Amino acid sequence: MKKNKLFWILTVVCVLNFAAHLYFYPSLPDIVPTHWGGQVNGWGPKSTVLILAALPFAMLILFEVIRKIDPKHQNFEKFGKVWNLFVVLFTVMMAAFSWLSELAVFGKLPDSSNLVSILVCGGIGVLFIILGNFMPQIKQNYTFGCRTPWALNDEHNWQRTQRMGG
């Protein structure tokens, strides 16, 4: 899939996510849960929900900027599928996590359950497993992968580092 098409698809996902949050925003209480440690143990103003809803789009923009300012940006084309997979997984995961506060407020999450911790840790774990599988395909760049000074200066070292890191 071309990166421009993917960017616009993810932009639509982020906008729809934010619009859905805006739809439910008036029905939220003034204080919403923002942190879980087995059960809700952190609270914040309901505007936090909108900040969390905007975060996936902000990260999507940041990923595009990073791709353009990296001194070895031409290498992104060589491992574009891995980078695109990371951007898709990360953006979708952030959009999904942005719903945890609303789900807790509307009673869709058990209050004294470790479900949130399991979902967040499980999602991040799956992301790392998938990335670990694809890390050997990453070419030299200053943004993505295991970036030690030695690996950045030597192509062979870079390949070995990514393979071991994965």
Annotated model-derived regions:
Residues 11-19, 57, 61, 65, ...:
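Generic alpha-helical transmembrane segments of integral inner-membrane proteins
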Residues 65-114:
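Ordered, amphipathic secondary-structure segments that act as subunit-interaction surfaces
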